[in-house]
Amino acid sequence: MAPGRKRGASKAKAKGQLVLGDLVLAKVKGFPAWPAKISRPEDWDRAPDPKKYFVQFFGTEEIAFVAPPDIQAFTSEAKSKLLARCQGKTVKYFAQAVEQICTAFEGLQNHKSNALGDEDSLDATEPGLTKAEIVDGTDHIVIESERTDNFNFRVDPCFPKLDENNGEERKAEIRKLDSSSFLESKVKTTSPVSESLEHSSFDPKIKKEDFDKGTDGSACNEHFGNGQKKLANGKRIKKEAGGSDRKGEDTVHRDKSNNSHVPGGRTASGNSDSKKSKGLLTEKTSSKVSADKHENSPGIKVGVSGKKRRLESEQGKLAPRVDESSRAAKKPRCESADNKVKCEIDDGSDSTGTVSDIKREIVLGLGARGGNFQYDKEAVAYTKRQRQTMEHATSPSFSGSRDKSGKGHLEQKDRSSPVRNVKAPAAQSLKKRRAVCIYDEDDDEDPKTPLHGKPAIVPQAASVLTDGPKRANVCHSTSTKAKISAGSTESTEVRKFPLRKHCEDASRVLPSNAENSTNSLPVVKPINELPPKDVKQILQSPKMSPQLVLTNKHVAGQHKVVKSSVKVSGVVMAKKPQSDSCKEAVAGSDKISSSQSQPANQRHKSASVGERLTVVSKAASRLNDSGSRDMSEDLSAAMLDLNREKGSATFTSAKTPDSAASMKDLIAAAQAKRKLAHTQNSIFGNLNPSFLSISDTQGRSHSPFMVQNASASAAISMPLVVQGHHQQGSSPSNHGHQSLSRNQIETDDNEERRLSSGHKSVGGSLSCSTEAAISRDAFEGMLETLSRTRESIGRATRLAIDCAKYGLASEVVELLIRKLESESHFHRKVDLFFLVDSITQHSHSQKGIAGASYVPTVQAALPRLLGAAAPPGTGASDNRRKCLKVLKLWLERKVFPESLLRRYIDDIRASGDDATGGFSLRRPSRSERAVDDPIREMEGMLVDEYGSNATFQLPGFFSSHNFEDDEEDDDLPTSQKEKSTSAGERVSALDDLEIHDTSSDKCHRVLEDVDHELEMEDVSGQRKDVAPSSFCENKTKEQSLDVMEPVAEKSTEFNPLPEDSPPLPQESPPPLPPLPPSPPPPSPPLPPSSLPPPPPAALFPPLPPPPSQPPPPPLSPPPSPPPPPPPPSQSLTTQLSIASHHQIPFQPGFPPPTYPLSHQTYPGSMQQDRSSIFTGDQIVQGPGNSSRGGLVEGAGKPEYFVQQSSSFSPAGVCSSREPSSFTSSRQLEFGNSDVLFNPEASSQNHRFQPSTPLSQRPMVRLPSAPSSHFSYPSHIQSQSQHSYTHPYPFPPQRDDARRYRNEEPWRIPSSGHSAENQNGAWIHGRNSHPGLPRVTDSFFRPPPERPPSGTMNYQPSAASNLQAVPAIPGHTAPQMLPSRPDIPTVNCWRPA
């Protein structure tokens, strides 16, 4: 027999088989590939060229001979490309040519589709195949229909026509059945049904075209209604295709073994065969329904619909229908009639050996008879209708036999229920082929309409329930079944929108079916009643259709009708195992639709199926029986699982199991697993309680699994399922609910959709499963490589926001929680919590999905997040601090309710001793990093961490991200913590560039960029807040909470004075670990003890001491340089502190290196340095504590000290240039500490180490680089230099000091202000050095009292007062002075 026209024909033509009239793109030199059509040269008076094609170009109407290599067939793909090209500039006439060829192409396509609709179905199965298949398939179908005489309404409508057409139409129809690989063989198995079909279905009136139309299901359903009549015809058909019939018999026998046994005689004689098969079926179905009843004959599931479709696609004419979806699944199966047979066999194997055999028989019979009826459109139409009718009529048994072969569970169910009538899905599959093509394809799924996407998934779940049958046919069967179900009501529409219509039809059918089911459903046991084995199976994998089938089987055992309907749906979907679930669902829907048109008895059966369909479409929420409900739960669980795995991916896999669907399914599966893990928690909160209660009502051990599935993809369908289950739970025979009007069902579907859209985890997964899976996987992968850098956290935040767009916000949060809980490293926990902070703050600032999803989700998960990120115990103290900072930031920004946050803050503080005031225990941020983190080794630079307020600080740059909280932390342990937290919080906001005052009680300072020098203004007038209040740079957001925290800790550390230095004032925060004793040489070897002290005193008005010892002390000290070290130690110490703050070399009076050294010399111990700085006050206190008492008290406050220290650590803190020497954490902490920490500073300070006598320390003149470096007024510098030059030249440290000076101006200005104009001179000098203010900045942070500008405001007069301290130019000198612990830099003096 000549092969039918193949789908691949157009492609073949493109390769060189172009014929007259074919549209092509011809390439002519100098022009783009031009639209043309193959023409006849004779028409243009040209001699044909055998080696070239004669083409006529569109647009220009020119002609040419073109070589084959330059010609390519015009396809849809080429069309799209051309249209895209036309969007831009094109060659003249090109757009016109494209338009013309597109018009011609569309016309050809329409013509082809019409021809294919009529002829292709015939051709696709090939005449022989069609005939044989028709004979066998018809017989089988008839048998099934007969068995399902109760479903007469199904069989009768189509079968009368089939009868008329008899052999020919049957053959054609069988051909289609064969092509669709529907359950024709299964139908064969049910000979009695086949007879019925034969009698009523072979009406010569029915044309192939009609059948094609009938494929929609309406005509077929009608014919199927007369199933028994068709059986008679079926006999004829069998006779016609003797060989096929025999094969059919063989197949029938196999089917028998599969629970849909129909003796070979069945094939031979429709009635007797039907009876035989009925007997066999009855036996297999546990004889629960007599074979004579033909009601629910356990007819063999004909899982060949999918295979037949494949055959069709192979043949090519049916291919147009199967074209897109069936194409993928079918083509691989077989390419020739023989191949088709094989394919059928293969599919049959999927559904069962029986189906395969049946298909074989059908194929052979079709092959034998196909020649005559290959193009018999009427026969084809009839066959399709017959198939549809058979499918509907035998849908219950169909599923049963499918179960048998495909899965023992369904098989058992079929056995338990005589309703196992062999569905004649073959016709359906053919009908639905087109829809299936669309439906099978992912694209089809989407085009089908929203219903298609979601209901399709739900039917898939249903398919999963009856998964055995749906294997072979699921993909095509889905659409086909949908068509069939619609076919009962509106098969044509179903074809167009198989899934959607299928759902709708199922909904419509369901009411009647539900009513009928109400009778039968009560018999069915709910899953909770089902044997634990069945339930267990179901529980094991709701997705697994076999398990669902088992449940169905059990139910069917109790309610054969319900079971058979369920089985039928399963049988319809007898295609691939992967696509089984989806296909089953579709099949169920189709069956339900067909059952709708079936008689009342059949309706009961179909009602079960319809219920399942409804349940499937509604996520198995509407199952009528408790058994149905159980199945529906299984389906819903499976569906949810499938949906979650791949909302539509599962469906897609069913559609294109051989294509990308598998990949999508894999992604969806992984996603589903994750969802299962976290959705169990989220679903219970998100899904309707009804669903949970339903699960509970069901008594399902797998209800949690279903719930999880529901959370993932059941949110759309599960809520419905929940409702349906709830109803069902109320009464196992919840038929009333299930028999709700189709409108109600549709309403439920709408609800489903709403739920899916509302339930983001579900809706997103279903609508954009692939994109969502990709986003989620990307986010999960980002978590594995997450670091604390702003870039890393920002990237992860963007991925999380993308996930929220797909409804995965709860999943992302759950993933973060699990990651936090499983993370063993505390520093990694902090990284993850910072990510939570970033996501939360970003969402809080956003409108839309992200903002609406993450904030409430994080709020609900806060207890778990905090419990995992900040666990109790000493080891997690840093985590608690950082979490506190984040919480405080949230509190400040009102991300969450204040009451909630305060409760958590209190809990965290109570959880650990250091939670509130453990800053002293804080480690440098780098030490908190992973051991293998290269950033840990980057000493001297601030890491670009999330929440870090400092970037890399290099000597020449100002650190604009100095931590404000450093001072805050210094002020109060708890306050410090809070401040650091606030600062950290601010920093944590990646977008937050503004400087935020961490604590309202602290003075708020505003940093101003003055000549690249940040000045801090004391807004609140509280010097404490100066540093903490504001960040030097907009990079505050950059500053990580970690960094801020370390700063706070450092502040705390800063509090403790060096052992040698006088204790900080009580008001200062608890001292951090004692800094290395900064020898408080109370002006150790100050050559002129009076000189050094006065200059320090003059030069270093105690900035911190302003409270206790305001400018007066500093002013007086400058006037009295003679005072010996003790007085100077007080004043000088203050001066030194000031000097150190200013980093003005007060060499003359002291070996300024000493204190500066102490500050800088103890870089290792930032606290010491701070102490030195504060110690400037404190040190002065040490040596001249009594005189400095007030100053120390004032300066004792860490901030003052910090400020002064800042002068010395300006490089580290304030100035970017010097910060490099300091660790980033130090910068964060305080300028002082940073300077001290700064290795360079420390090394340089080492010269001036307090331990080293000032005399021992190298003397460097302040006037040198420091002053010039800071560009202090020459007079001041000269004064300082003069005053201190002869006493002490500044040692080389001054370079460090210079760096510090660069920063120092920063600090000094702040210190100066804070220092109450004591640092006026110093500030003036600093002011002259805008670049230096960094240091000063660092300082003004520490001394909130001093306005940053104050330092700069200090007049040279102050400097003159400090003339003894001419070292101002060499702020390094002050740093050096700080080297003398006895001389508090800040405490020494304050300009009047």
Swiss-Prot record:
Disruption phenotype: Hua2 mutations enhance the phenotype of mild ag-4 and elf4 alleles and also induce early flowering by reducing the expression of several MADS genes that act as floral repressors like FLC, FLM/MAF1, MAF2 and SVP.
Source organism of the structure: Arabidopsis thaliana (Mouse-ear cress)
Biased segments, Polar residues type: 184-194, 391-400, 591-601, 725-744, 1157-1175, 1240-1255, 1265-1284, 1311-1320
SUPFAM superfamilies per the UniProt record, alphabetical: ENTH/VHS domain, Tudor/PWWP/MBT
Cited InterPro entries: CID_dom, ENTH_VHS, PWWP_dom
Low complexity: bias regions: 1215-1225
Distribution of this protein across tissues and organs: Expressed in the inflorescence meristem, floral primordia, inflorescence stem, and floral pedicels. Also detected in the shoot apical meristem, stems, leaves, embryos, and roots.
Chain segments carrying region Disordered: 184-354, 384-428, 575-613, 723-766, 957-986, 1014-1356, 1369-1392
Domain CID positions: 771-912
Biased composition annotated in UniProt, kind: Pro residues: 1059-1129
Role according to the record: Transcription factor that functions as a repressor of flowering by enhancing the expression of several genes that delay flowering including FLC, FLM/MAF1, MAF2 and SVP. Also acts in the floral homeotic AGAMOUS (AG) pathway, specifically by processing the AGAMOUS pre-mRNA. Functions in association with HUA1 and HEN4 in AG pre-mRNA processing. Involved in all three aspects of the AG functions, the specification of stamen and carpel identities, the control of floral determinacy, and the spatial restriction of AP1 expression.
Feature: compositional bias, Basic and acidic residues: 196-215, 239-258, 311-345, 401-417, 1293-1306
GO BP annotations, alphabetical order: anthocyanin accumulation in tissues in response to UV light; cell differentiation; maintenance of floral organ identity; mRNA processing; negative regulation of flower development; regulation of timing of transition from vegetative to reproductive phase
A single MF term (Gene Ontology): DNA-binding transcription factor activity
Gene name linked to the record: HUA2
Primary localisation category: nucleus
Disulfide bonds: none
Keyword Ligase: no
Listed name of the protein: ENHANCER OF AG-4 protein 2
Domain PWWP residue range list: 20-77
General remark: In cv. Sy-0, a naturally occurring allele K525E, termed ART1, together with active FRI and FLC alleles causes delayed flowering of primary and axillary meristems, resulting in the distinctive Sy-0 morphology.
